[in-house]
UniProtKB/Swiss-Prot annotation:
It is found in: Endoplasmic reticulum membrane; Cytoplasm, Cytosol; Nucleus; Chromosome. Residues 2-212 are annotated as: Required for E3 UFM1-protein ligase activity. GO terms for biological process: DNA damage checkpoint signaling; DNA repair; erythrocyte differentiation; hematopoietic stem cell differentiation; negative regulation of IRE1-mediated unfolded protein response; negative regulation of NF-kappaB transcription factor activity; positive regulation of autophagy; positive regulation of reticulophagy. The gene is UFL1. The lineage of its organism: Eukaryota, Metazoa, Chordata, Craniata, Vertebrata. This is E3 UFM1-protein ligase 1.
């Protein structure tokens, strides 16, 4: 029992100790941070942690510390410095600084610095001390000294003028502050200096020499002049050109200007400038406000001179003569000024259509120009008649055709000699225009209608040609130098420069008139030669028929070859026989516009394009297609365009019959044989022999270029005996070697030709030995060879 009570007392004592014991549990730092973070997130607590993250600061504490630092620093502190002192992020410093500026009008935020009114008052006191010492201060100097913007400083100091700062701000140049004593001292200096001036003096020189403040000087000077304290005027504005002119000098100056103008009727700007007037034009306008003056580049003239020139020009225009206005005006006036004066006079007379200005100073009437034109009338007619006799061709002259032909020949001559010789051979084979014109059906040819034809030199016609080169050809009348010689003979009193410009002016109209005279002469000549034109119509019909049938027969011969060879043969036909028949049509159509040439084969692509530009719309389209197809590679297209062109020109094409074809084949073969007999050129012999053997084998004519000879020889394999074909192959190889050796010989130097010459001689001898045998393949065919029936 006693033990139980003892246990109870012990438990009671433990309970009592537990009741009176203190709690020893505390929150950890991490728990504190989490709690504060949660409170900040729920916006129940507004604090800012420091940059080192060890402390929290309230915004109110930041504001308090900013105020304290601003006071300690004398009313001006940089926000960046506050960040280092308060040890929080710059963003929080800026936010609190903006709040302080909004809440307190006495604090301003300028260029990242907090500035209060007490600092500005202290600043104004310092500036005032400096102002009283120097007499003037400039805002720009203060900006550099105190590191503050000019506008802010000007505004802050303006509020303290008269209160803290004893001075005034220059009203025209608000960047300077003066004291009254400084202004009075400068006014006295300016008054004394300008009172002593007796001649025009540039103000800028005085500023530099005596060290005046520029804006202050101009304002004081203007005040003294307006109050008549200084007798004079400032001309040229408030710039570097400003000049102070004393009244005594101005009166003398004005008297001279008035006297000169009264006596001469004009004023030179350069003379006034030498008198010390920096702005002569402005001075004259100001002095002679009510006087009617004409201002030129370097002078001005009075109405009296203008009236005198106007009367002289009017008389010249009425009498049909000319005059050099420079003789009526002062010699000091420049040519440019005289030209301006003349333009004004011509506008006032309103007779621009009756008179022209040459050389800037000479007025020439239209009547005088017409009389000069008449001097060339007889010359035009005589020259046109002479040209018609010497060159009875027309808007496309023989000379133009010759020039075009020479250009083409110059290009052809640059080719290899082999191609040149073979070209001659093919021209020989294609130039035979045989055919029984008597057996053919008559071809009816009628000239195209002229209805709707437009003038050849119209813009629309020019555009339709599709090239800027197809301009109407002009007959040359006279060169400008020749015209000058004629004018000098008849106008001996005219100056040289007038003769030159007059000839230049007449060049185009005289040339145009000459074209009309030539047209007239040629038209009369054409009408008189109509009978002879009808006489040649039959020849034209026969030649067209022969060419057309030849093209058809040559086309048959191309069908025996591969596509590539056919294309080459077609191109050659288009460049030769097809071009001939195209030129024949173009030459015939061109006769309507007096555009013919006796030798139509000399017509080039350029000349055909020019002829197209003269044709009416309904004819031009088909003829353009025909002209373009010559540059293609399809005989079918060309023949279809040829048929269309023949329909447009009312040329009825009749294909030849079998009898006529045999006759043409025979004539063509005989022509080639005759050519083969007389030639000794190995390349030409090979070419003619191959073409004749082809005709013997196929009974078809062939018009081929030299480069197609190997293909013809390959075709003959199996068509002629093997020994004949082998002879052709051998002869072909020798011809190729000869051409190669000739080419190398032309490229090598003279001292390296011995070996090449020996090889060439060997080849030449071999060719001479078998040339006769090759010719005999055609001239003396064996019975075993295939011959034409």
């Amino acid at each position: 029992m006693a033990a139980d009570w003892e246990e109870i007392r012990r438990l009671a004592a433990d309970f009592q100790r537990a009741q009176f014991a203190e709690a020893a549990h505390r929150l950890s730092e991490r728990n504190c941070i989490e709690i504060v973070t949660k409170l900040i997130a729920e916006k129940q607590l507004e604090v800012v942690h420091t940059l080192d993250g060890k402390e929290y600061v309230t915004p109110a504490q930041i504001s308090k510390e900013i105020w304290d630092e601003l006071s300690v620093c004398g009313g001006r502190i940089n926000i960046v410095d506050l960040q280092q002192i308060i040890n929080v992020d710059l963003l929080h410093i800026e936010n609190r600084a903006n709040d302080i500026v909004k809440s307190d009008k006495a604090v301003q935020l300028v260029l990242g610095q907090l500035i209060n009114e007490s600092y500005l008052d202290q600043l104004a006191e310092e500036i005032n001390d400096k102002l009283q010492e120097t007499g003037q201060v400039t805002i720009s100097e203060l900006c550099k000294a105190y590191d503050l913007p000019g506008d802010f400083l000007t505004q802050a100091l303006s509020k303290r003028l008269g209160r803290i700062i004893h001075g005034r701000l220059d009203q025209e140049n608000r960047g300077v502050i003066f004291t009254e004593a400084f202004v009075s001292r400068h006014r006295a200096r300016i008054r004394g200096l300008f009172s002593a001036i007796t001649r025009p003096t540039p103000v800028s020189n005085l500023i530099t020499r005596y060290g005046f403040q520029e804006h202050l000087l101009y304002s004081v000077l203007e005040e003294l002049v307006n109050t008549s304290r200084l007798k004079g005027t400032v001309v040229g504005g408030k710039q570097d050109k400003a000049v102070f002119v004393p009244d005594i000098y101005a009166r003398t100056q004005s008297n001279w200007v008035d006297s000169f103008f009264k006596q001469n009727g004009y004023l030179e700007f350069d003379a006034l400038y030498r008198l010390g007037i920096p702005d002569p034009a402005g001075y004259i306008k100001k002095r002679y406000k009510s006087t009617k003056l004409l201002f030129l580049r370097a002078a001005c003239v009075g109405q009296e001179i203008v009236d005198r020139v106007e009367a002289s020009v009017d008389e010249v225009i009425s009498s049909g003569s000319w005059i050099d206005v420079a003789t009526l005006l002062p010699s000091s006036l420049s040519v440019e000024d005289i030209g301006i004066l003349l333009q004004q006079v011509m506008r006032s007379l309103n007779k621009n259509s009756s008179g022209l200005v040459f050389s800037d100073t000479i007025v020439v009437s239209e009547k005088f120009i017409s009389s000069c034109t008449d001097l060339f009338s007889d010359m035009m007619k005589q020259k046109a008649e002479k040209e018609m006799k010497n060159s009875p061709v027309h808007l496309i002259t023989e000379e133009d055709l010759k020039q075009s032909y020479v250009l083409e020949n110059s290009y052809t001559n640059k080719k290899d000699k082999k191609d040149e010789r073979r070209k001659k051979a093919t021209e020989g084979s294609g130039s035979v225009r045989g055919g029984g014109g008597g057996n053919a059906r008559e071809i009816k040819i009628k000239k195209t209608k002229k209805k709707g034809r437009k003038d050849a030199d119209s813009d629309e016609e020019s555009q339709a040609t599709g090239t800027g080169r197809n301009k109407q050809l002009e007959f040359h009348f006279m060169s400008q130098e020749e015209m000058q010689d004629v004018l000098k003979t008849h106008l001996q009193d005219c100056p040289e420069e007038l003769i030159t410009e007059l000839a230049e002016h007449l060049m185009r109209p005289l040339t145009k008139s000459y074209q009309e005279v030539v047209r007239s002469v040629f038209t009369s000549s054409t009408s008189s030669s109509g009978a002879s034109g009808r006489q040649t119509m039959k020849d034209l019909q026969e030649e067209f028929s022969n060419l057309y049938n030849n093209i058809r027969l040559f086309e048959k011969g191309t069908k025996y070859f591969t596509d590539e060879t056919q294309t080459n043969l077609a191109k050659h036909l288009l460049k030769t026989v097809c071009t001939d028949i195209t030129n024949l049509i173009f030459n015939f159509l061109a006769s309507d516009s007096m555009m013919t040439t006796e030798n139509y084969s000399t017509i080039t692509s350029e000349v055909r394009t020019k002829i197209l530009g003269k044709l009416p719309e309904d004819t031009r389209g088909p003829l353009t297609k025909l002209h373009t197809s010559l540059n293609g590679k399809s005989l079918e297209d060309f023949l279809s365009y040829l048929d269309a062109a023949a329909d447009i020109c009312d040329i009825m094409v009749k294909k030849g019959d079998k009898k006529k074809e045999r006759q043409v084949l025979f004539q063509h073969r005989q022509a080639l044989i005759e050519q083969l007999k007389v030639t000794e050129d190995p390349a030409l012999v090979l070419h003619l022999t191959a073409v004749l053997l082809f005709q013997f084998s196929t009974h078809c004519m062939l018009h081929a270029p030299g480069r197609s000879v190997p293909q013809i020889i390959n075709f003959l394999s199996g068509k002629i005996p093997e020994d004949q074909h082998s002879l052709l192959i051998k002869y072909q190889g020798l011809v190729v070697k000869q051409l190669i050796s000739q080419s190398k010989k032309a490229e090598q130097e003279d001292d390296n030709k011995t070996e090449e010459e020996e090889g060439a001689d060997t080849i030449r001898k071999e060719l001479q030995e078998i040339t006769t045998s090759v010719k005999d393949l055609v001239l003396r065919p064996r019975k075993s060879s295939v011959t034409e029936e």
